[in-house]
């Protein structure tokens, strides 16, 4: 077999475009069950893997995994409409970050938390923020959860984990809000593709790419247009 053949790389084979529907089905099932999904962005972008959990289905075990295995910067991905209802303003007036990541001010639940740092407290904060009746009185700033605002077009507008999180939650039939944290290695470096696949296999988690989500949405749009 030629050494340049993608099939010679078992990890590359995991991302066969023909298997995208199966990867998406596994990821959406996991979102509905509150199981983390390992999502990779493009190799020429951040080239990082995030663990993503539907905000509606967040559990103590899921949050503990985010804190233990990831960077510790737990982010809540929201639509612009939800962020506005919560009264969340941008973290800075002029966003100069490399990828335009739309951080708002950090938040804490107004009631029900102590220091806000524990897994239980961060879950309380996220539940307060995504509750159907949540408003600007539900949370305070600063805090230990970092909201991110997704662009309206999702991954078709911006190929970021923020948009991927909201798209996955919406595609799973849940509220359009996701919780994410960047996967890290024990030595403090960021997990890349092969590291992320090994982690997913060790923990029995589905793995997919932002490209998978974009292709899935494009296929859905074509199916609707031809219906």
UniProtKB/Swiss-Prot annotation:
Keywords from the UniProt entry: Lyase, Magnesium, Manganese, Metal-binding, Plasmid, Riboflavin biosynthesis
Enzymatic reactions: D-ribulose 5-phosphate = (2S)-2-hydroxy-3-oxobutyl phosphate + formate + H(+)
Cofactors named for this entry: Mg(2+); Mn(2+)
InterPro entries: DHBP_synth_RibB-like_a/b_dom, DHBP_synthase_RibB
Assigned protein family: Belongs to the DHBP synthase family.
Quaternary data: Homodimer.
Protein's name in the database: 3,4-dihydroxy-2-butanone 4-phosphate synthase
Organism from which the protein derives: Ralstonia nicotianae (strain ATCC BAA-1114 / GMI1000)
